[in-house]
Amino acid sequence: MKFYKYCASGNDFVITNADRKEDRSSLAKELCNRYEGIGADGFIVILPHEKYDFEWEFYNNDGSRAAMCGNGSRAAAHFAHHINKINPSMIFLTGAGVIKAKVNQDKVEVSLGKIKSVQNTFEKLGKTWQLCDTGVPHLVHFCQSLDEFDTMLCQKMRQKYNANVNFVKILDENHLKVRTYERGVEDETLACGTGMGACFYLAFLNKKVQNKVKITPKSGEEMGFAYKNEELFFEGKVKYCFEANYNFS
């Protein structure tokens, strides 16, 4: 199987064009294993589609399916344009719905569309939370310091609510910093596009930031987010790393 390794703002992915009906869940676990495989946060399978430019299947590195991955969608768009020669403005289908993307060399902008749902704030484990669905569910806690991030606490919240967990610090009305514990990876990751999107949207909804901001994840790679016409957009660099063939068991 030919595969391509991509990185996007701290998240890394293995991407391939579907050419057989293998057990993709088991394959995802094998490929994404950082000790015995290629190593990645997620596995993306690109499939043809009659109506859209393509369809994808996204797998977390534990083999579970995910409806959406923000940085994964940007990596998939970069791959579709530069490898599969699809037009730079594209529309593709995910488990969370239709995604629009624009590729400009190594920068990719993606629209996550309309926010799926937002719940009221609540108290749990000594902190205030809000749940926001940007294609996948995210718990968000606004904090005074990102040193408050606690992996054990995140594990408890993730298990109870079956959601990703984000801590966000507002630096000013145009800049946020975010740390994310990702469901499916079951650990803190260097970045999470849908998580940063949830943090931005809730901050904007609560009138704490403007409708266009910069967000810095743990990777340190700044990304741009904007909310316009009731859609959430974000943009950042995508890096093609390498391509190779893999003989899976």
Curated annotation (Swiss-Prot):
Pathway: Amino-acid biosynthesis; L-lysine biosynthesis via DAP pathway; DL-2,6-diaminopimelate from LL-2,6-diaminopimelate: step 1/1
UniProt-annotated site: Could be important to modulate the pK values of the two catalytic cysteine residues, residues: H138, E182
Catalytic site: C69, C192
GO cellular component terms, A-Z: cytosol
GO molecular function: diaminopimelate epimerase activity
Family under the similarity heading: Belongs to the diaminopimelate epimerase family.
Protein function: Catalyzes the stereoinversion of LL-2,6-diaminopimelate (L,L-DAP) to meso-diaminopimelate (meso-DAP), a precursor of L-lysine and an essential component of the bacterial peptidoglycan.
Identification of the protein by name: Diaminopimelate epimerase
UniProt lineage: Bacteria, Pseudomonadati, Campylobacterota, Epsilonproteobacteria, Campylobacterales
